């Protein structure tokens, strides 16, 4: 049983490192240097691709825990926020520019989805709840 917990923590930390690297690469290469040179539509595509990459990494790693509520929450939050981003993005593509306030909301949602914050929070909840359940059993 001790070996299983070590492997779960190792897998979780590895996922956190990969998400942090993706997050850093986005900010270094696409947010600061590359993005000013491309059109608005390609910015949307780049942002969407990075959200999907982080979503895929999180899904792959969190699936290893075999905790149904955690995967449901992960999928639910991503479906809701990605849907909101898609609606805002499609409106921006087809009806012209969106207001700065809506753009700030979209940027905040995007930042939340690609940052390691959600992944970390879910991991902390899992390890705390798992630890509490283990201590109740003993």
PLM regions with names:
Residues 49-58, 114-128:
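Hydrophobic cores of alpha-helical transmembrane segments in multi-pass inner/ER membrane proteins
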Residues 2-7, 61-74, 132-137:
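Membrane-interface helix-boundary motifs at transmembrane edges
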Residues 77-100:
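C-terminal halves and exits of single transmembrane alpha-helices
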Residues 89-90, 95, 122-129:
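Hydrophobic transmembrane alpha-helices of multi-pass, membrane-embedded glycosylation machinery
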Residues 8-23, 78, 82, 123-124:
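Alpha-helical transmembrane segments
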């Amino acid at each position: 049983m001790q070996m299983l917990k070590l492997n779960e923590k190792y897998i979780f930390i590895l996922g956190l490192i990969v998400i942090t690297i993706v997050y850093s690469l986005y900010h270094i290469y696409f947010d600061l240097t590359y993005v000013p040179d491309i059109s608005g539509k390609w910015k949307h595509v780049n942002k969407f691709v990075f959200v999907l990459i982080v979503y895929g990494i999180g899904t792959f790693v969190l699936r290893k825990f075999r905790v149904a509520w955690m995967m449901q929450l992960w999928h639910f939050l991503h479906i809701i926020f990605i849907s909101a981003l898609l609606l805002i993005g499609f409106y921006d593509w087809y009806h012209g520019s969106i207001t700065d306030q809506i753009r700030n909301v979209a940027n905040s949602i995007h930042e939340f989805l690609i940052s390691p914050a959600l992944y970390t929070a879910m991991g902390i909840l899992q390890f705390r709840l798992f630890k509490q359940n283990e201590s109740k059993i003993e």
